[in-house]
Amino acid sequence: TSISIGIFNSQNGKNIFSETCSCTTNINNINQDLNQLENILEKKIFEVEKKTKNFLNEVYLMVETSYSNSIGLSLFKDNEDNLLQKKDILYLIQDARQQILRANKNQSIIHILITKYIIDLNEFDILPLDKKCKNFSLDIKFILIPEILLKKIEKIFNKNHIVVKKI
C-alpha cells in the first residue's frame, strides 16, 4: 500500500506539499489492524501542519483498494416533450442510489459518476438543461467500498481531530 498526500492552497490551487510513502499495511485486508497506517498518517499530519502553520481540520480523501466495487447503470425516462430540468436528473440519480444501497448492504457509495447523457437519441458529455425532449437517459457509475473500511479510515482521522469531508 502506498499513501499519497497532496496539500493545495484553497485560494489559488497551488501545490503546497506532496509526498508518497510506502506502508506495509494492506488496506485491502479490512480485518487487519491499521496501526502502521495510523502512525504514518499521524506523522504526515504533523509535517503538513508544521509546513502550513495551520491545523488540519478537514480532508478530502482518494482511496484505491481492491475492495472497491463499481456498478454501472443506464436509466431511462420518458419526458413527454417537457423541458429537461436538473430536478429530473437528480430524482433519477437519487432513486438509483437508494436501489444500489438496498442491494449492497454494508457498502458505502463514495463516488457517483455520470458518464453519458442521451437526449432524444443524441449523446452529450454535459447536460443541456431547459431543453424540450421526448426522452432521456443517463449512464451512471457508482463506486462503493465496505462501510467497515470507511469507518476505520474515518476513525484514524477523527483521533487527530480531523473530519473526513469526502472520500
Put a short name on every predicted segment.
Residues 1:
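Two-metal-ion RNase H-like nuclease active-site motif
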Residues 6-58, 63-167:
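Nucleotide/phosphate-binding catalytic cleft detector across ATP-hydrolyzing
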